[in-house]
Design a protein with these regions (language model features):
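Extracellular (secreted or membrane-anchored) zinc-dependent metallopeptidases
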Residues: 1-183
Length: 183
């Protein structure tokens, strides 16, 4: 990923599904995206609180695609997210929401049926850690790693992914060329 921070516009968005939908439809934002050749649009906004909890980020995603990465034209419209700058670790939230944009889902324990691939999900080990796409509280920990699930890496002897079960790194390798050609 490359960050070109000079292409910034001020907004007052909060992390909500309604605001993500308005981003998709906003012709000015689409024009800026085209003008700056942005593969993704990330809006730094604020958290959305409700009786169900606090939403620190929200993203367009392609869950449940049954191991078929959609063609360029269909998928590129999902490449928007809102990340709150007033809610937890903004960097991890930013990475998590981009993970959704790139076809990754939460952990199997959270009920994820995968992202673009059935195994494109987060991973965690009870009382030890959770990877970027997994919620740490589901694994009784506060230790969220700044890694996507990857069976090729280990932390204190524990693999941070499982082949064909939780391997976000492999999924990202497979979708890289499609994403790079969005703009």
């Amino acid at each position: 990923l490359a960050w070109e921070g000079e292409n910034q516009v001020s907004t007052n968005y909060v992390a909500s599904w309604g605001n993500i939908q308005s981003l998709y439809k906003n012709s000015q934002i689409r024009n800026w995206r085209d003008q700056y050749n942005a593969d993704f649009v990330v809006v730094i906004g604020s958290a959305q609180s409700s009786s169900g909890g606090t939403t620190c980020g929200i993203a367009g995603s392609i869950y449940g695609m049954n191991d078929v990465f959609p063609d360029h034209d269909a998928y590129d419209s999902y490449a928007y997210n809102i990340t709150a700058n007033n809610c937890g670790d903004t960097t991890l939230t930013f990475m998590h929401e981009l993970g959704h944009n790139m076809g990754l889902g939460h952990s199997v324990r959270q009920g994820a049926e995968g992202g673009v691939y059935s195994w494109a999900v987060g991973y965690g080990v009870d009382n030890q850690f959770a990877t970027i796409m997994a919620y740490p509280q589901e694994f009784n920990t506060t230790n969220q790693l700044s890694y996507f699930s990857n069976p090729g890496l280990a932390l204190n002897g524990e693999r941070i992914g499982v082949n064909n079960v939780a391997d976000s790194q492999r999924a990202l390798e497979l979708v890289t060329n499609t994403i790079a050609n969005f703009r």
